[in-house]
Every structure is written in C-alpha cells, then in structure tokens.
Amino acid sequence: MKIQTNAVNVLERTSAYLRTGVIKETPAWYNVVASIPPVTKFTREPHKINPSTDKKVSELKDPDLESVNRNGLYKTRFNALERKVANKQIYKPPKLVYLEDKIRTLFYKQHPWELARPKIVSENEINTNPDWKNMLQLGQPLDGENVVQRTLYLLKTKEQSNITDAYDQARLEFYRLRMQQELEEQVAAEEAEMFGSVFGPSTIEHGVTKEQQVIEKWKRDAELQSELLSAKKENASKAAGDASAVSSEKQVEDDVVNFDESTDADQEVLHF
C-alpha cells in the first residue's frame, strides 16, 4: 500500500494556493503548522529514549568474552531476551511527585501520634490565602500541615537554602507552639478545677473502662465453660464406673450359676 503524503504536504499546497490566489485569506492554522511542520520521515524506528524522562529504555551490554559457560564455551552474541527492548511503558505518564508530599510523609512518620488528633476536612478552606511568615494561622489548628507550609515558605523566601535546615527550623517552631498550647490547656484545666469544675473521664479512660468490661465478661464465660467441662468429665467417669460395677456383678452371678450347675452334676454322678 502506498504511503499517503497528502497531509504532510498541506503546508506547501496551501502556500501555493495563497500565491496563486486560489485562497484569499490565510487559514488560522497556517502560522502554527509553519512554525512546527509535520514530520516527513515515515521510517519507523525503535524508541530507545523515554521522552518523559530522557533516559535510555534499555541498553545492550558488551558480552563478557572472558567468562565461560557451563559447556565450556564463550559467549560472543546476545540472545533473543537480551535483544528485546522493553518499551511497553515508554509512553506511560510519570508519577506526579510533589515536595509537599515528601515533607508530609516524613513528618507523620516521625510523629505518628499527630494523626490521632481530631481534624475536620474543611479546616484548610477557611483561610484561602495564608501568610506563612508565622506558624500559627487564624482559624486553622496547629498540625503537621503548618510544618509543611512553613518549610516551603522558608525555601521560597531563601531564608534557608537547604530543605533539611528549613524542615528543622519549622519543626523547632512547631515544638515550641505545641508545648505552649499544652501548657495553656493544663493551666486552664487547673483553674477550672479550682473554681469547682468536674471533668468526666477522658477518651483513654473511657476506652480502658470498656475494655475492662469485655475482659470481665470473657472471664465469667471462661469460668462457666470450665465448670461445664469438669462436670462432663465427672459424669463420664461416673458412668464408666457404674458400667464396670454392673459388668463385675454380672460376671459374679454367671460364676455362681456355673458353679451350682457343676456341683449338681457331680452329685448326680456320685449318686449313680
């Protein structure tokens, strides 16, 4: 089948039509196609460079002429598997990687208990244009997201040239604010108790109470099951003892009957 080249020559034909007056107005796509002309080479070649990463997909290594296989022969050529170019994923889009995700993952890996704090999804939507000159933001609680955004701000404003130093500075500010927050909460609780406030059990105490109730129920069920098993064993042993006693009595009766029969037979023989 002949290769169709009409679409490739559209720029030349349109230029000729414009010069001869066949087309009066320049098409909207003319300048774009003129700046980026279509490819005129139709020879298909294997893609050995990934256009997304500009890295080689595969590269044949020179055979090791000094190594000998198990048959005592030298390898001088590539096999079919080595010549195969694995370019199935060459046009697969690369994964999107953001610096925020790396910082966020590192922070919550180092501080896993920060994930246990209650959080509302709409908290970040309150202030859509925050200024991260300060760690604390109006309407947004202190959490790991403050550390992430503060680190990016330090890098963007060139206050810290290294991401490690920026992350350490953001963590230090976070620790100071967290300690201040916990101290304020503790002082407020002590003042409230001084004025007569009574606080109920905390979440941890409530969980421990519920767990203890389950353990007590399990203990009662285990004791009941143990009593049932011991009763079954006693009944089984008692039934086995009764059966052995009945069989022994029956054996005695049979022995007595056999003895009487043998005695009568001996007396008849003597009388005769």
From Swiss-Prot:
Gene Ontology molecular function, alphabetical: structural constituent of ribosome
Biased composition (Acidic residues): 252-272
Membrane-crossing residue ranges in chain numbering: none
Cell compartment(s), UniProt: Mitochondrion
InterPro entries: Ribosomal_mS23_fun
UniProt keyword terms in alphabetical order: Mitochondrion, Ribonucleoprotein, Ribosomal protein
Major localization class: mitochondrion
Cellular component annotations (GO), alphabetically ordered: mitochondrial small ribosomal subunit
CDD domains assigned to the protein according to its UniProt record, in alphabetical order: At1g26750 (cd23701)
Region (Disordered): 233-272
Subunit structure: Component of the mitochondrial small ribosomal subunit.
Family designation: Belongs to the mitochondrion-specific ribosomal protein mS23 family.
Protein name: Small ribosomal subunit protein mS23
